[in-house]
Amino acid sequence: MFHQTLDLPEALVTGREDIYLGWFYRTYPARPDAIPEADIAEYLRVYRQPGALRAGFSYYRALPQDIADNAALAARFKLPMPVLGLGGDRSWGRGMEVVESLRRLAVDVQGGVVENCGHFMPEEQPEDLLRRLIAFLG
């Protein structure tokens, strides 16, 4: 995966954050205009800070270890407390895959699919997300 390659993503994206990251912010939501331009500008400002791109790409670099750690944990026990999983129904929102993935790690998985939502749930469906969080945590 490109994001897992050491140093290459930083070298290619630095100075071009608007092209690379802007593409994700306009392509991964259910609607290309779901994230306001002012919000995208702020995300880009933050990712232009020293070390920010490396931190962002390092999330993906850690995935193989996370997968191994989670598999080892799931073989020994499952989380006993309720766990909430939500996935958008469109464009990299992952739908029910989120809930199904969590069922390998927890006994009581709640949640489901958020409609008209892609990858960026808090930005795309904030009211629906808040309603579900309040119901789960309340």
Language-model regions: role of each:
Residues 119:
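Histidine-centered divalent metal-coordination motifs
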Residues 1-114, 122, 131-136:
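Flexible "cap/lid" subdomain of the alpha/beta-hydrolase fold that forms the substrate-access gate
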